[in-house]
Amino acid sequence: MHLTVREEERIQLWSAAEMARRRLERGVKLNYPEAIALICDEILERAREGSIPMLTDMMEYGATILKKHDVMEGVQQMMKIVQVEAMFPDGTKLVTVMNPIRD
């Protein structure tokens, strides 16, 4: 099977996000890379399925995925911005989420 670099990156992101989901289910707090992976994967999946078609709505959704109690101490302060290119029904857009982990 031959994958493009973008496809390989997407698989790696999904894998990290799945690990993060499993850890959250067990009550384990997420570290920085796990939190980034989970937020990005959720945004990419919602954009792909078209359930959140507006960019501004997706930016708001990105800030609801994780809360402060879901991540290790200090992760919320380190994560000021998350950006990911997502494929929407009308094309690729850069989704920017400011302060993605809220109280």
Language-model features: where?
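Non-transmembrane, aqueous-exposed alpha-helical and coiled segments at domain scale
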Residues: M1-Q83, M87-D103
